[in-house]
């Protein structure tokens, strides 16, 4: 008999599975790795997670489009493989370049070191370090400064929460996002217009993503100004909250592992950002920014066809793709319950897979380790006393994590 799951019940199920992912998903990986119950699906094994994320024809991100439309308009994070997606993806990839990575690393180190130098024996890893550094570096690179960091963070978090997390369509979350979008759109429109005027006047302008987008030749797929605004809003909303959370939860995990934290600090002191990154990304495997991604089954299809676990997923089903579970699948990951910094990058699904692999993957593979290096390279850190030393949340986002800096 089919089981009807209301949207609000789906939201509750996502939360409860997330709260108990380790206890629930391990037995599912073994005994029932693919779940299909009425309009709901869940995949838990690494091969199946990558199959679903890689099959954008059957498993779509179409559910994000209506919310994006009311916020600003379509942008690549919520587009399936269409001519619009390919055009805008090509335009953004032409201006967000691999050769920019050293510049982003240096900017991150500089901003992070300023924060540590100004601290007096204690710093909040979220509010006083990660959030202002990420905002400064990433919006500086994009060319999209907000009125101030608190406003930019509020805009990004509220928009992200409605578009990507509000599966229960709570009116309060939607209203808050629409209000903030009403502030953010004219702010960016004015900034884009001012930059375009400066370019036309021959004024000196920064070599950032916005300038590059505005200077793209028409025959190379140049985006019009409203499309530029759509995608910049999408990049800001999709970038700042997720990187901040990823950094915060990784630091929380390392603080729970004193031996690994000590070795990560030594790597930072030695200037080995690649090794620092290995500690951070391994910490994220145990405590991820998100435990699953949501996809909608566009056409009835079978996952893991030809295997004993082959399961039909119905058209319209909401499918939770359990990325954290995939990173603990012993069929794909060696010694998954050990904390190891020698893992191949393929073991990680932090940034998704397939068509909608995180657009910022290459940047974040150096930006997050640089952020960690700036925090860890100096005084030894430990939890601040009391409640301040534990990771705190404001809704879905980390809001505080105090650490003491040794003399």
Question: What do the predicted segments below correspond to?
Answer:
Residues 1-407:
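Cytochrome P450
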């Amino acid at each position: 008999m089919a089981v009807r799951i209301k949207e609000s019940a789906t939201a509750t199920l996502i939360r409860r599975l997330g709260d108990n992912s380790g206890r629930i998903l391990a037995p599912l990986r073994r005994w029932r790795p693919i779940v299909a119950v009425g309009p709901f699906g869940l995949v838990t094994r690494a091969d199946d997670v990558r199959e679903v994320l890689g099959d954008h024809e059957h498993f779509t991100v179409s559910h994000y489009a209506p919310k994006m439309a009311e916020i600003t308009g379509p942008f690549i994070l919520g587009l399936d493989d269409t001519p619009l997606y390919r055009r805008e993806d090509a335009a953004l990839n032409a201006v967000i370049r691999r050769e920019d990575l050293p510049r982003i690393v240096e900017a991150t180190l500089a901003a992070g070191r300023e924060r540590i130098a100004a601290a007096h024996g204690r710093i909040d890893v979220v509010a006083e370090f990660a959030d202002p550094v990420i905002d400064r570096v990433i919006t500086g690179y994009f060319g999209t400064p907000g009125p101030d960091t608190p406003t930019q963070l509020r805009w990004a978090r509220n928009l992200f929460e409605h578009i990507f997390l509000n599966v229960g369509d709570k009116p309060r979350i939607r209203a808050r996002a629409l209000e903030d979008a009403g502030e953010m759109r004219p702010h960016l429109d004015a900034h884009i217009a001012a930059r375009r005027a400066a370019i036309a006047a021959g004024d000196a302008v920064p070599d950032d993503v916005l300038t590059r987008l505005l200077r793209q030749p028409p025959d190379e797929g140049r985006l019009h100004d409203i499309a530029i605004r759509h995608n910049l809003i999408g990049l800001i909303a999709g970038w700042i909250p997720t990187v901040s959370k990823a950094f915060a939860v990784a630091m929380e995990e390392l603080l729970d592992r004193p031996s690994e934290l000590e070795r990560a600090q030594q790597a930072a002191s030695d200037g080995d950002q690649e090794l620092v990154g290995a500690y951070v990304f391994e910490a994220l495997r145990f405590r991820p920014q998100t435990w699953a991604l949501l996809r909608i089954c566009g056409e009835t299809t079978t996952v893991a066809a030809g295997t004993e676990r082959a399961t039909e997923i119905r058209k319209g089903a909401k499918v939770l793709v359990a990325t954290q579970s995939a990173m603990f699948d012993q069929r794909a990951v060696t010694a998954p319950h050990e904390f190891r910094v020698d893992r191949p990058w393929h073991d990680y699904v932090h940034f998704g897979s397939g068509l909608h692999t995180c657009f910022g993957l290459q940047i974040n593979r150096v930006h997050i380790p640089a952020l960690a290096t700036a925090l860890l390279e100096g005084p030894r850190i430990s939890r601040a006393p009391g409640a301040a030393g534990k990771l705190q949340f404001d809704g879905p986002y980390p809001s505080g994590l105090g650490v003491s800096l040794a003399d």
